[in-house]
């Protein structure tokens, strides 16, 4: 059996929807992918950000990133659901070369390095 390709779907929700509704959209799209046979690997809320240009008269949007793998049939299913939703103002799915790397730790929050790495004086 060959390895299924990896995909990353980024979508932007309207900025005026409440937080509970944002969570329901995130859950809805995860469930759609799972029911279609894809494996959801990661889901990241990027938060409300300013758009580079207005989309549907909105200057901000709530960004959500969804990483998944499957045979490719699931991409059409989730994009159709997003196209029919009035709360999704933009979406894009790209095929990845491999799984996403582990999340990076923000500077200043990682544990201090071990002293064994220091050169002797």
UniProtKB/Swiss-Prot annotation:
Residues 99-121 are annotated as: Disordered. It holds the Pfam family Ribosomal_S6. Disulfide bonds: none annotated. One of its GO terms (molecular function) is structural constituent of ribosome. GO terms for cellular component: cytoplasm; ribonucleoprotein complex; ribosome. InterPro entries: Ribosomal_bS6, Ribosomal_bS6_CS, Ribosomal_bS6_sf, Ribosomal_S6_plastid/chlpt, Transl_elong_EF1B/ribsomal_bS6. The keyword Protein biosynthesis does not apply. Residues 110-121 have a biased composition (Low complexity). The keyword Ribonucleoprotein applies. Keywords: Ribonucleoprotein, Ribosomal protein, RNA-binding, rRNA-binding. GO terms for biological process: translation. HAMAP family: Ribosomal_bS6. Belongs to the bacterial ribosomal protein bS6 family. NCBIfam families: S6 (TIGR00166). Binds together with bS18 to 16S ribosomal RNA. This is Small ribosomal subunit protein bS6. The gene is rpsF.
């Amino acid at each position: 059996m060959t390895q299924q390709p990896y995909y990353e779907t980024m979508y932007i929700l309207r900025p005026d929807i409440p937080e509970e509704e944002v969570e329901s959209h995130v859950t809805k799209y995860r469930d759609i992918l799972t029911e279609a046979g894809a494996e959801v690997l990661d889901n990241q809320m990027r938060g409300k950000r300013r758009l580079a240009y207005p989309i549907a008269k909105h200057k901000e949007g709530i960004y959500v990133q969804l990483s998944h793998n499957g045979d490719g049939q699931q991409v059409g299913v989730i994009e159709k659901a997003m196209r029919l939703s009035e709360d999704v103002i933009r979406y894009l799915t790209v095929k990845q070369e491999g799984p996403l790397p582990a999340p990076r730790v923000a500077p200043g929050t990682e544990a201090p390095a071990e002293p064994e790495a220091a050169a002797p004086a």
